[in-house]
Amino acid sequence: METAKDGEQSPSEASPSAQAGPENIPEPMSREEESQPLYHEETIDLGGDEFASEENEPTSEGSHNFGDKLNEHMMESVLISDSPNNSEGDVGDLGCLQDVGEPPRGATDHRLPSSTDKEVVDTLSNGSETDGDDTPRDISDMTPDSRASLKEDSTQEDVTSMPALENAATEEVGPKDSLAPREEQTSEVSSNQSSSKDEPLPVCTIFSQATATPSQPHLFLQDGFESQMVKSPSFSSTSETSAKTPPPMVQPSPSLSTFFGDTMSSNSLASDFFDSFTTSTFISVSNPNAGSPVPEKLSSLTAPVGEKSPDSTSPSYSTRMDRSESGVSRAPLDVPESPKPFSQIQAVFAGSDDPFATALSMSEMDRRNDAWLPSQATREVLMSVATQQYGTVFIDKENLTMPGLKFDNIQGDAVKDLMLRFLGEKAAAKRQVLNASSVEQSFVGLKQLISCRNWRAAVDLCGRLLTAHGQGYGKNGLPTSHTTDSLQLWFVRLALLVKLGLFQNAEMEFEPFGNLDQPDLYYEYYPHVYPGRRGSMVPFSMRILHAELQQYLGNPQESLDRLHRVKTVCSKILANLEQGLAEDGGLSSVTQESRQASVQLWRSRLGRVLYSMANCLLLMKDYVLAVDAYLTVIKYYPEQEPQLLSGIGRILLQIGDIKTAEKYFQDVEKVTQKLDGLQGKIMVLMNRAFLYLGQNNFAEAHKFFTEILRMDPTNAVANNNAAVCLLYLGKLKDSLRQLEAMVQQDPRHYLHESVLFNLTTMYELESSRSMQKKQSLLEAVASKEGDSFNTQCLKLA
């Protein structure tokens, strides 16, 4: 006979999603290409709006000298990009805002054609347009002859871009140094004046970033490994854009126990868990289309055909990729007043609500949640990656994380299988549940499956999404790149497997992650994808799950060892914070409010580790150490003191220590006297009922359970235990009526596995012809429950 107890949910955190993006690095042109227009290079103009006008609109003759303005504007672009900071990081930050400022006064506010706008926004949204190690490209000055020619003729002309400078420090080119190229350019510009007026002007700048389109694939450096196409599970290829899109926000996810608990609250939806990485426009390595703003829309699993997968990267850390060629961005010629460098920066931030404060808030939240202390070997690898300039850091394949699905079979539906066996095909056809193919192939569908308790279908969908990330079946042991997106998917899949009791499958798929300390599981390993971000990409709850899994496989000592390692790191981080340092022990300049938030977070995480250790000790039947561990947890969760003391008392009841259990129950009454509310009174009455159960006084226990039901008629624990008391009092019929009435009253809430197990046991005690009643329960389960229901409680097999 199974007696339901109060379930306690344990807190856990999930790491956020983050930004990533591929990068293309420009290459210097040869001498022969200097005087030819780059028709096959796509270029981006930092100030595209100042040079844009309606198509085929001629330039007015009263405008300023075009050559001077173009030259001055391009030189300012070089000055901006050649700042001491990494240009790649700067461009990534500006691109995330995706705001285009108003042109200076006196300039015509014309926009580029829609296709050009999309290409510019997509490319600026890419987090790594250029590499700080590469030499910036410059535009040579034009001769006075060519300026005169441009001033006389007001039609649109082709302007050729000059080769990149060999020295990055050289920002200005003197007239003597570029005399020969200018003469060649002058003759060519003069000859081009007789061309058609409809020829567009390719706008030149220092960046050469190709837009990922189906007809323009990226060319990656050949690394000897199979490249996989990655389609983002979080964003669609919708081409619509908006004028403004809020900056991407990274928010921590709530506890999985909220959604995987035995009793699900109506206001605890699975959508809450995934909001942190489905409602923000994050930029991912496997998601180069994230830059295209898709406001208030969640995407399907689609991506341009020409995209390359992060799986094509080699096991060694490499930053070089070949530059792809594409069509030149075309826009009509306009000659506004040339803006100053600071005007350009202000134009980018125009219309945003304090973007610097937003970025600071995001970084503080990331720092708190992502902080972790790597091992010495991992720290050395990350330092070599951070300090490398022009070389490549090579890492052994054994030190990388290369996961893949170990099984790809469909999980199926055990409830429907039982219906086919006992009720026939006609009855089984009436069962309609969601599966992995009937929902959107994205996080939206994953949330829907979890909220409907179709966890087996959710496992299948996680496998499909991981396959889209290049980590599917058969990919185990192959090089891959990780994102917070993919690691969240792994965590959800593994948590679902553990919840379904598929411990062996979870262990096999956890194996490639090792001890979760490989260097490619840290943000520092991807400086061009996550510029400036530090910490671990692994969710903290995934570390807890990794440690707890072994106790379900019969290795509780291994679980304790892993939990002790996690506890050591949490204690060290908490000690650093309490000493006024950063999480990693370095100097910190955060505000007092932010420091208090970090201390609170890591105290909560340390308490969560101790809670898992206490559960493991309880499983090992080391009750003395388990009680001590639970008492220690109270220091970190003082608001849960009544629940923890009640749990300790019930543990003592199970081992027969009635007096000590009564002492702890009295302590609960003292604590709850300070609290007002119904829950405190119910907790005290429940403890008294269990105390009488431990003394085999079922009549008194039934009285207290009945009193609880008068105060809270929906209390399933009290209802189930009251029926059990009636059974032990010899009142089988009354016990059956109470359980049946409870199930019929609210099937969705009371079709609990423990309740149904007790009910089927009573059916067997009542009559040898209990199969028909069990089949009736199966029909009720089929109409309400998802595919995660444990059919063993029905005792039909």
UniProtKB/Swiss-Prot annotation:
Pfam families: TPR_19, TPR_6. Residues 1-257, 286-338 are annotated as: Disordered. SUPFAM superfamilies: TPR-like (SSF48452). Keywords: ER-Golgi transport, Nucleus, Phosphoprotein, Repeat, TPR repeat, Transport. The keyword Membrane does not apply. It comes from the Eukaryota. The modification Phosphoserine is found at S125, S128, S234, S309, S314. Phosphorylated as the cells enter mitosis but is dephosphorylated at or before the onset of anaphase. The phosphorylated form recruits CENPE to kinetochores more efficiently than the non-phosphorylated form. GO terms for biological process: COPII vesicle coating; endoplasmic reticulum to Golgi vesicle-mediated transport; Golgi organization; metaphase chromosome alignment; positive regulation of protein localization to kinetochore; regulation of kinetochore assembly; vesicle tethering. The modification Phosphothreonine is found at T130. Residues 29-43, 66-75, 107-121, 173-185 have a biased composition (Basic and acidic residues). Component of the multisubunit TRAPP (transport protein particle) complex, which includes at least TRAPPC2, TRAPPC2L, TRAPPC3, TRAPPC3L, TRAPPC4, TRAPPC5, TRAPPC8, TRAPPC9, TRAPPC10, TRAPPC11 and TRAPPC12. Interacts with CENPE. This is Trafficking protein particle complex subunit 12. It comes from Mus musculus. The lineage of its organism: Eukaryota, Metazoa, Chordata, Craniata, Vertebrata.
